[in-house]
Amino acid sequence: ITSDEIQQILIKSASDLISLENPNYQYVAARLLLFSLRKSLHHRLWEHPHLKEHVNNCIKLGVYDDEFLNWYDEEEINTMNDMIKHDRDYIFSYAGLRQVIDKYLVQDRSSGQVFETPQFMYLMIAATLFRNYDKEKRLSYVKKYYNAISQHNINIPTPVMAGVRTPLRQFSSCVLVDSDDTLPSIFSSDMAIGRYVAQRAGIGINAGRIRGINSRIRGGEVQHTGVIPFLKKFEATVKCCTQNGVRGGSATVHFPIWHQEIEDIIVLKNNKGTEDNRVRKLDYSIQLSELFYKRFIENKEITLFSPHDVPGLYEAFGTPEFDELYEKYERATSVKKKKIGAQELFLSILKERAETGRIYIMNIDHCNTHSSFKDVVRMSNLCQEITLPTDPLQHIDGAGEIALCILSAINLGALKNKEELENLCDLSVRGLEELIDLQKYPVKAAEISTKARRSLGIGYIGLAHFLAKNKLKYESPDAWKLVDEYTEAFQYYLLKASNQLAVEKGQCEYFNKTKYSDAILPIDTYKKDVDSLVKRKLSYDWSTLRKNIKEQGLRHSTLSAQMPSESSSVVSNETNGIEPPRDY
């Protein structure tokens, strides 16, 4: 038996002993796993190669970006080598280190050979992000960012952790693709989806414009096949790539509740039916507005339409003009329609949601009321935390707008005090800002809009840990007050950081397409019913910030999002996102 086989037996034995009663075995197993990694990589446990030697080796192997040595001189590389704290590898729990090794460290996935340790990964990410900063200050930012991510104060998502430092430059977690009701648009959207799925992105698809089954085409020459055949095409594209072995492709498709085929759409994931009338490997988001909630409460009917038969209705969805136009089409005798009880339809949606767990609800009017954009938001992303404007493609290299969002999160569970948020928010914004120009864009419509809007999504992980640390429960008024205080600081410091970057680099090109350009801030648009739950005054100087934003602008169109962080939070040994803990 080899020493490596003995080590693997020890790792498994220690991991099998992890329990609620004996949680510290997670660190025993992690250390054994770490020593196995170091031995296979460096052939020793305690000594590590110099950063330059490590980088040269990885460049020769083709797993690191070969431009790195052009960015930094030898003196800077020596300084960065001294920054690395390899003992921080001991911070990992077993699950966290296992996740890092399996998903994030650069490696040959066919042979299983890993080429870096976690601390080299973190340092290379920080060095790559701040490569374009002035030479006098960039190493200071590299050190601060390295310290923040290696100590798990800032959480970075899968595309960033797996991709920054490598030749594959695609770091957006969220890609939103909007399809029109034409074959060129549907096929162009499908190609765009394929290109981004292959590069680690999660996909949001808007198919709400596609006309319903048996609709007339070319004056009745052809009857439409409906949405399901096109969803099958999207499904095949999403699932044909395993995203470089990092994660499988996934997508959420969006439809308005008034779509003609909604009754067939909401059952697409269940286990009844046949392969011909089910599309189970996609998730679905059903879009509602206040009108439909009123119909539900009053036990009235909802009228279903094919979007093609009601010109302008889809474009009005999510705006104040929708209700009047919708009721006008309900009265029109010449328009093909179908009526269904609102309560019957709602209960069907809730039943499928309860049984499959992957049918989401998107309140489209609420999203537009509270968004930072003047443009209408028509869809969300894979995990439903992002609301960005989109415009359908008509050709893969043509006009349109594919929305991209790069994510990160502040680890609330690791915070010692609220004042730490200022530095962490600034570092998060600056780091993600650099990725927008570093990454490559496989579709032109994504590059144009992303560089013009510069959308970021920075959120929380570890909220449950944070509350537990403060001896508070989710349902406690004291918890609401504390979260309100921290979230005010969080929003304030994100906006302050973006405003400072606007001073340094200029406001984003589409700043005037945001509500921020009219000095409308999150403190103006949040749902005021919150004030009945948390009675306190604002703590920060919002009036000065408002003035600065009005005069100097922001570098980003939007800054915050509460992503689920299901896999990346495991690395930090934290509860995911803002979610409460689930049963053991």
What are the functions of these language-model segments?
Residues 1-584:
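Extended catalytic cores of very large enzyme megasubunits
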